[in-house]
């Protein structure tokens, strides 16, 4: 409900080379680009969403664009739970587990000071995500985040084109004018886990989306440092996971239906 995932063809269609000139159409390039994708959001108001996921392919390389809080006009500071609340939640979760499960987990944990073990675990997680944030207040801000597993730096045009798209979409959808400038919706390159080869960019894009949905960012103090968001081993088995999912769906579709 809070998110919308665009098709992997959306950005390609938005940025498709324009062969017509302004004198032929009577409109600016931003309006002509929006015209090409205007029907892609006819059933959804993207400004009612907190997060917009846009897969981007540039020169055979995939990366993720995440537009956050597009309806906000300025950053907001809101209250967040404190560290004691997090500990209390974890304590409550432990109480609700079956005793046998708790004993099994206890026997599998390394021996040592429990507080140090918990501290070590939380230290490895980004401190801006829902599972590890211990701040009293957090920052929600309208922004365009880029998660690139190759840490490339040619994204300025991406920020510009998407700001223009949002501006025209707002005008068409809301019937009023609003500026989506660099000051009102900041662009930022996130520090994320990086690939160690030349072929896994698509897998990392999928993992960025999955990790955000499972352990979303809650404090948008830029730039986001998500280096420890997930281990590289998690991406290495992603192809096998996808293969098993495809085979599962295939079996479900080919099984004879009960009459």
Can you describe what each PLM-predicted range is?
Residues 1-131, 139-143, 155:
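Cysteine protease catalytic domains with a Cys-His-Asp triad
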Residues 142, 150-153, 157-258:
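C-terminal folded domains that constitute the principal catalytic or ligand-binding module
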